[in-house]
Each structure stands twice: as C-alpha cells, then as structure tokens.
C-alpha cells in the first residue's frame, strides 16, 4: 500500500522507547501470549452504558481520533505476511516495516504521515494530495455546497483518490488530507469544519492583504490552522487526559526527534477506543433529538452528514458524554467493527492486541519496569494482579485470561491502571503520552509560531481562537460551552 499510493509518503520508522519482543528477536510475532479473541471478549466486554465520570464529551473522543490521524498512519503490507486471528472473519495483513532497517535487525513499523501537529489530516502529507485538495483560487481549499444548508462540505473523492471506504455514485466518499476521514460521521464533521476554518482565514487574509497571491494566502491560512490545532491540543485537550504531565513549552531542541513511538501509536494512544459510545447523536438547533444512529451502522456511512449537515452532529458531540476510560469497549467496536471493504464482525480490541504482537510490544510489566522503573519484575508475585490495578473486578477478569501478571499485554495493562488523580490515565500511559507530546513540540522548530506578516489584528484574533470559537464561526451551532471537551446539555 505504501509503495503504490502516491498520497502516502514521509515513510519513517517509528521510535522504540522499550525493547522489542519477537520470538526470533527480529520479526516473528511473540507466541507466548494469551488468546487475543478471548482477552477481547472477557476483559473488554461492556454491559450497558458507562458514562465518563469526569463528564468528557464525545467531542473529546473525536478530537483524539482527529489528532491521531495527524500524527500517525501505519499501512498494511501483505508482503510482510498476515495475522491469523482465530474467531475473526479473516486474517489481517501485517504492518509495513521501515526500509531503513537492515537485514538481521529488529523490524519497526512505518509512519507514512508527518509526525508534527501540522494539519496533515486536513491538508495531506504529500504534494499530490495537497494539490488535489486546493482550489488554487484565493488560497482556499476545494469545497462543495451542502444541500442541507448554505454551508460548505468536502469535495467528493474519485477512484484515484485513495480514500478508505467504498466509492460509489449513491454514497460518495469525501476527499480529505487523511485517507481515514470517512470512517464515521463524528470524525467527518471535524474534517469538514477545519476545511471551513482554513477558508475563513483565506478570505479574511485576502481582505487584509490585497497584494497577496493564492500561494501566500494558502500558506498563511494553513499556518493559522496549524497553530490553532496545536493550541487546542496542548491547552484544551491534553490537560483533561494527562493533567500537567506534558509541562511547559521549553522551545526547540535540536537534539530531540519527534517521530512517533511504537508504544504510543500501538498502545497508549489507542485509549480512545474505550471512550467511544454506541451511537452517533444528532441534535437540532433547539436541542431536540434529530435521531441517533447505532455506531455499528455508521462505519463509512455519510447519510447523517448528508441528511443533517455537520451542525447536528457537532451539537450531539457537545452534548453527549463519552464512555469511561477503562478496559471495556462497546459491542459496536468489540463485536461488529467493519473494515473499509465492508467486512463486518471484527473485534477492535483483538485487532489492537494483534498489532501489539505485530509491532513487537513487550508486556505491560516489562515496559513499565523499563520506562518508569517503579517495579522489579524479579520480585513480583506472578499471581498478584493488584500490581496493575486496585479494581478487584478487573483483577479477576485479567486473572481469568492471563496465566500471570507477566503475560498481560501493554495495551491492556495501561488501560487497567488506576488513573492519576485529576486525569484519565495511569502512570505508564501518562508517561508514554507525555513523552510523545513533549517531543512532538520541542522537535518542531516552528511549533506555536505565527508569522508577523499576518498583521497584528489577525494574530490577536488567532491567539484568542478557542475550539468553541472555531465551532461557532464555522457552523450554525450557537451557545457552545467554553470547554467543549466537557459535555453539556
């Protein structure tokens, strides 16, 4: 996939924070673990609704997915073999591995998008994709009229666009910077809104700078959107997740690399799957229900967007509470996940665990010992799961599928940890996520900068543009709460 698609580039090896675990030390997946499907069905089984105790909104969940798609994409490569998940509809191809790894060295999964928070999910990661998205008029991105309102929607993709999802005349796939943009209506609403935000700034800059050409307007508008995404991430979103663990901006560091770590992409930043609720909610401007859709029916389904526009979907995300961040996943993801090709019946939990083996993640205990150093594996009681969590019901679930604590997968153990007070995360996942976002910031020479050429008035407006303000100026959604990541009716 990475070799044939012109819209995937920047192919780099992901970093490793801990030692890789392969049976042969190179690439053969570890064979001593628990049954992946059994773990997914026992540990991650969720019985009913479990609203987030901190009141996080569905928009918090969606922005996390939107952000993830800016940072990392690891394509599959059938030439690398398959992962045979007993109980799943069919096997899954292994991930593409980085070419720069020499023969005999431990493999590393690739990342084919830029690691910076640069809006690549909106603009693309290659010149080909960027050009395909541009109108080349007034610095703006291509859009089409929304048939339900006077607003703008993303352009339709064609068969040469390499977008995930089935492309047909009856149910078009929308074109965006990231190939996964059409995965669900909530995600699609943010993809659309930030294109509108770009065009808002392109228009405003054109009024302020009459002598600027299309290229200047495009570059300036994009730089503003990049800045806004960075500020939302660090000032509004991350504090809810990990508190102040990321710390203050210390400026550019030439000795740091920002490339995404395997522990981040394959374990810690997959926490959001436990936050996902079982429905896509839509609300009218007066707060009345416009009809929800079961999550399992929403995969690559654009009808909610086409029928109601993105406004109703965004209102639903502002109002609805996410699920608890724990070791439970709604059935829609744990039993009825659907692939872009339309194959249903997958378990996202099982796939995540399989990717952990594919990417050579070590166990929770070993990674914790290496990265935090607060435990000594040699002194642990193998049957004492309280070293992971104080929740006795979770301990019992873990003990029913894992032979001992040393067998617990990194993703599972990280989700099971007791959260640090005032955050959503336990110590190990907090460490991994804080490490990533610290490096993402300090390794980016232009992070958080605005070009003085924008003008004082524009800069002042940009610097006060919270997520709530961005929603209000690009949609018909009124009375948006100041903190959009806490649900409000």
What are these regions (language model features)?
Residues 1-200, 204, 223, 227-350, ...:
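N-terminal accessory/cap region of cofactor-dependent oxidoreductases and related radical enzymes
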Residues 201-217, 350, 354, 375:
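Inter-helical turn/loop segments and adjacent helix faces that build the functional surface
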Residues 209-210, 380, 407:
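Short, flexible coil/linker elements and helix-boundary hinge sites characteristic
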Residues 217-223:
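Alpha-helical scaffold segments that form or flank carboxylate-/histidine-based iron centers
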Residues 371:
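Flexible, acidic glycine-rich loops studded with aromatic residues
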Residues 377-401:
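Short linear, low-complexity motifs centered on an aromatic residue
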């Amino acid at each position: 996939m990475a070799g044939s698609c012109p819209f995937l580039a920047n192919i780099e090896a992901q970093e490793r924070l801990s030692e890789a675990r392969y049976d042969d030390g190179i690439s053969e997946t570890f064979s001593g673990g628990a049954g992946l499907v059994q773990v997914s069905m026992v540990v991650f089984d969720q019985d009913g609704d479990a609203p987030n105790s901190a009141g996080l909104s569905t928009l918090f969940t969606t922005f996390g997915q939107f952000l993830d798609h800016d940072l990392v994409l690891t394509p599959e490569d059938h030439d690398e073999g398959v992962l045979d998940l007993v109980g799943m509809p069919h096997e899954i191809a292994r991930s593409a591995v980085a070419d720069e790894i020499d023969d005999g060295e431990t493999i590393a999964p690739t990342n084919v998008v830029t690691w910076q928070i640069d809006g690549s999910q909106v603009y693309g990661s290659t010149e080909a994709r960027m050009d395909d998205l541009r109108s080349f008029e007034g610095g703006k991105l291509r859009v089409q009229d929304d048939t339900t309102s006077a607003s703008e929607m993303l352009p339709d993709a064609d068969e040469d666009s390499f977008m995930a999802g089935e492309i047909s005349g009856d149910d078009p796939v929308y074109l965006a910077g990231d190939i996964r943009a059409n995965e669900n209506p909530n995600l699609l609403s943010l993809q659309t809104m930030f294109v509108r935000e770009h065009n808002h700034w392109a228009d405003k800059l054109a009024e302020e700078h009459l002598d600027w050409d299309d290229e200047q307007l495009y570059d300036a508008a994009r730089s503003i959107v990049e800045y806004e995404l960075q500020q939302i991430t660090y000032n509004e979103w991350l504090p809810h997740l990990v508190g102040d663990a990321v710390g203050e901006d210390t400026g550019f560091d030439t000795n740091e690399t920002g490339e995404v770590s395997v522990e981040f992409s394959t374990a810690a930043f997959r926490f959001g799957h436990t936050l996902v609720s079982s429905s896509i909610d839509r609300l009218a401007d007066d707060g009345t229900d416009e009809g929800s859709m079961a999550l399992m029916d929403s995969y690559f389904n654009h009808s909610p967007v086409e029928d109601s526009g993105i406004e109703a979907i965004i209102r639903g995300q502002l109002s609805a509470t996410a699920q608890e961040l724990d070791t439970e996943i709604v059935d829609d993801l744990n039993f009825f996940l659907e692939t872009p090709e339309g194959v249903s019946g997958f378990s996202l939990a099982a796939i995540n665990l399989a990717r952990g083996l594919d990417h050579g993640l070590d166990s929770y205990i070993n990674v914790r010992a290496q990265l935090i150093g607060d435990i000594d594996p040699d002194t642990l009681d193998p049957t004492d799961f309280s070293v992971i969590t104080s929740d006795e019901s979770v301990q019992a679930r873990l003990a029913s599928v894992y032979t001992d604590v040393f067998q617990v997968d990194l993703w599972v153990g990280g989700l099971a940890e007791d959260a640090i007070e005032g955050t959503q995360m336990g110590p190990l996942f907090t460490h991994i996520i804080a490490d990533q976002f610290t490096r993402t910031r300090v390794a980016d020479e232009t992070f958080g900068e605005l070009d003085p050429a924008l003008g004082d008035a524009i800069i002042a407006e940009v610097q006060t543009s919270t997520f709530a303000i961005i929603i209000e100026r690009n949609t018909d959604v009124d009375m948006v709460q100041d903190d959009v990541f806490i649900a409000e009716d």
